[in-house]
C-alpha cells in the first residue's frame, strides 16, 4: 500500500523502543546490564582499506553473535546464533576505515526487553558514540532488533537471560553495480520512494521512477509512490552468491532513472539495489509490500 504520509515503518527503524530511561546518544553503563561483561568482536569480510579513498564504494555491516540463553526454570541453551544487521553505507557517508575501527574497538553486550508486548533483543556498544554516523550502532551506542527476526524462532516464546559468548563483525563489499543515492542527496534532505520489508529493518531506497512510468500511474498527491506500487509485481529478489544475508533487486531499466545514483560501471543496463535481510527471506517478489518515503541518510528524522 502506498502512502505519502505514512512514516511509521521508517520511524520504527530510526527510533526503536527505548531501553529503560536511556535516550539517543546516551550509552548504557556496563553495571546496568545484568552484570554482563562486554565482548570485543573478531572480524571477517571483504575489507580493503584502499577502498576508503573511493567515494562510490558501498559496504554492508553485520554483527554475527553466538549467545547462551538461560530461561527461567529451564537449563541453559548454549551456542545460539544471532544475526544483527547494522546497515549498508557508502564512503560518501562516512570513511570506511573509521567505521571499521570504531566497530572493532567497541565492547558489546546483549540484553532482552519487552515493549508493547513485543520481545526485543538490544545490542549495546559500550564506549563513545559518533552522533552523526549513518550506522545506528555507532551513532547512538545501542540498537534494538525484534527477537524472532534475529535469533531462531524456537527461542522466542519465553523470557531469557542472554550471555554473549562470541561476536564477529562481517563487512561485505557490495558489487560494482550497486546503486546508491548520490552524494548531494545523502547530505541533503531529499526523500526517496522505498519499499518496506520489515518494521525493524530500514526501507529499501529505490531510484526515482522515469517520467513515462510516473504518467502511467499519475496522481496529484502521491503519484511517484503509486508508480512504484504499480510495478512492484515486476521486481524480483535474488540472493547474492557467497554473501551472508545480502540480497539484490535488478530494476527494469525502462522504468527507473539512475542519473542520481552512484554507478561504477557506466555500461550497466539497469540499476541494482542491495539490501540486508535474514537468510530465509522469501524470493517471490514484493507484492503487497508497503511503499513509503524514506531518507537515504538514516541520521535524518522524518517530518
From Swiss-Prot:
Keyword annotations of the record: Host cell membrane, Host endosome, Host membrane, Host-virus interaction, Inhibition of host innate immune response by virus, Inhibition of host interferon signaling pathway by virus, Inhibition of host JAK1 by virus, Interferon antiviral system evasion, Membrane, Viral budding, Viral budding via the host ESCRT complexes, Viral immunoevasion, Viral matrix protein, Viral release from host cell, Virion
Subcellular location(s) per record: Virion membrane; Host late endosome membrane; Host cell membrane; Host endomembrane system
Gene Ontology CC entries for this record: host cell endomembrane system; host cell late endosome membrane; host cell plasma membrane; membrane; virion membrane
Subunit structure: Exists as a dimer until it reorganizes at the plasma membrane into multimeric form. Interacts with host TSG101. Interacts (via PPXY motif) with SMURF2 (via WW domains); the interaction positively regulates virus budding.
Known function: Plays an essential role virus particle assembly and budding. Promotes virus assembly and budding by interacting with host proteins of the multivesicular body pathway. The interaction with host E3 ubiquitin ligase SMURF2 facilitates virus budding. The interaction with the nucleocapsid and the plasma membrane may also facilitate virus budding. Specific interactions with membrane-associated GP and VP24 during the budding process may also occur. May play a role in genome replication.
Domain notes: Late-budding domains (L domains) are short sequence motifs essential for viral particle budding. They recruit proteins of the host ESCRT machinery (Endosomal Sorting Complex Required for Transport) or ESCRT-associated proteins. VP40 contains one L domain: a PPXY motif which potentially interacts with the WW domain 3 of NEDD4 E3 ubiquitin ligase and the three WW domains of SMURF2 E3 ubiquitin ligase.
Additional detail: Most abundant protein in the virion.
Protein name: Matrix protein VP40
Organism of provenance: Lake Victoria marburgvirus (strain Ozolin-75) (MARV)
Gene: VP40
Amino acid at each position: 500500500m502506498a502512502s505519502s504520509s505514512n512514516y511509521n515503518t521508517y520511524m520504527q527503524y530510526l527510533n526503536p523502543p527505548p531501553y529503560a530511561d536511556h535516550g539517543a546518544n546516551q550509552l548504557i553503563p556496563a553495571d546496568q546490564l545484568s552484570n554482563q561483561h562486554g565482548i570485543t568482536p573478531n572480524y571477517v569480510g571483504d575489507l580493503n582499506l584502499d577502498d576508503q579513498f573511493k567515494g562510490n564504494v558501498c559496504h554492508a555491516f553485520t554483527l554475527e553473535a553466538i549467545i547462551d540463553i538461560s530461561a527461567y526454570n529451564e537449563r541453559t541453551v548454549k551456542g545460539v546464533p544471532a544475526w544483527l544487521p547494522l546497515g549498508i553505507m557508502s564512503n560518501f557517508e562516512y570513511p570506511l576505515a573509521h567505521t571499521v575501527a570504531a566497530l572493532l574497538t567497541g565492547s558489546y553486550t546483549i540484553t532482552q526487553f519487552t515493549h508493547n508486548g513485543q520481545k526485543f533483543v538490544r545490542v549495546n556498544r559500550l564506549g563513545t558514540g559518533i552522533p552523526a554516523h549513518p550506522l545506528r550502532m555507532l551513532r547512538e551506542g545501542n540498537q534494538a532488533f525484534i527477537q524472532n527476526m534475529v535469533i531462531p524462532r524456537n527461542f522466542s516464546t519465553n523470557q531469557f537471560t542472554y550471555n554473549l559468548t562470541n561476536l564477529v563483525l562481517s563487512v561485505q563489499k557490495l558489487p560494482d553495480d550497486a546503486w546508491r543515492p548520490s552524494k548531494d542527496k545523502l547530505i541533503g534532505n531529499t526523500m526517496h520512494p522505498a519499499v518496506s520489508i520489515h518494521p525493524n529493518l530500514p526501507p529499501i531506497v529505490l531510484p526515482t521512477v522515469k517520467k513515462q512510468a510516473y504518467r502511467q500511474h499519475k496522481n496529484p498527491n502521491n503519484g511517484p509512490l503509486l508508480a512504484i506500487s504499480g510495478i512492484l509485481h515486476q521486481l524480483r529478489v535474488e540472493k547474492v552468491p557467497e554473501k551472508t544475508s545480502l540480497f539484490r533487486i535488478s530494476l527494469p531499466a525502462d522504468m527507473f532513472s539512475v542519473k542520481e545514483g552512484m554507478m561504477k560501471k557506466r555500461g550497466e543496463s539497469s540499476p541494482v539495489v542491495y539490501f540486508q535481510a535474514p537468510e530465509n527471506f522469501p524470493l517471490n517478489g514484493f507484492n503487497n509490500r508497503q511503499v513509503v518515503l524514506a531518507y537515504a541518510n538514516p541520521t535524518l528524522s522524518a517530518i
